[in-house]
Regions:
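N-terminal Rossmann NAD(P)H-binding glycine-rich loop of SDR-like oxidoreductase domains
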Residues: 1-23
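Conserved Rossmann-fold NAD(P)-dependent oxidoreductase catalytic core, especially the SDR/UDP-sugar
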Residues: 68-70, 95-137
Length: 204
């Protein structure tokens, strides 16, 4: 199978590349950056283009992948410190990726989402029928990504799948900031020598 991974450098991306190669799939990579910097595991071919590039459609057409996986909520190319601006770029990038891949009649597009779309902590398991209630610009952008995928599935009959990963964290690369609760709490502890918590925070 021909697999096209889309996302910035991260341990998750490395794990996906390793898994695809181990399973014998021909793996391609779109980095989302033009400069070519970044440490990735070796793939069959790597493309250094931003997601909104007009070249993305030509790349997808030439490679003709059976499966495209967009890291979405876990893509390190996005800096959510200015979430209002980044949310616009995020949804525009996803739309361009889906539009570029729409030519493939029997291909599958997988979008990685996260639990942030629910907007709060839950003390028990979240059922898939639980309505999303995203509050931050980042969460709203990620949820909008799910809706965009659904729209392409309904209107273009594309095989789009949304995977919501719950509390998936890792050790950030040296010198890289992260946006997950564990990173934020550790940063707070280093700055203030304490971690604030209240009844709204659940630590299972």
């Amino acid at each position: 199978m021909i697999v096209f991974l889309v996302g910035g450098e991260s341990r998750l991306m490395d794990a996906l590349i390793t898994k695809m190669e181990k399973d014998g799939h021909k793996t391609y990579l779109l980095t989302g950056k033009r400069d070519g910097r970044g440490k990735y595991r070796r793939v069959f071919e790597r493309y250094n283009f931003p997601y909104d590039s007009e070249s993305v459609r030509e790349i997808f057409t030439n490679v003709n992948p059976d499966l495209v996986i967009f890291l979405g909520a876990y893509d390190t190319n996005y800096d959510w410190s200015d979430a209002r601006r980044e949310s616009v770029r995020y949804t525009a990038d996803l739309t361009n990726l889906l539009s570029a891949y729409a030519f493939k009649q029997n291909g599958r597009f997988v979008y990685l989402s996260s639990e942030v779309v629910y907007g709060r902590s839950y003390s028990s398991d979240i059922h898939e029928t639980e309505p999303a209630s995203s509050k931050s610009f980042q969460a709203m952008a990620i949820l909008q990504g799910e809706n965009i995928c659904k729209s392409y599935r309904d209107t273009r009959e594309m095989d789009t799948r949304v995977l919501r990963f719950d509390h998936m964290y890792d050790i950030p690369r040296k010198g890289k900031a992260d946006n997950n609760p564990c990173f934020q709490m550790m940063l707070e502890m280093l700055k203030t020598n304490q971690i604030a918590a209240n009844s709204r925070n659940v630590f299972p």
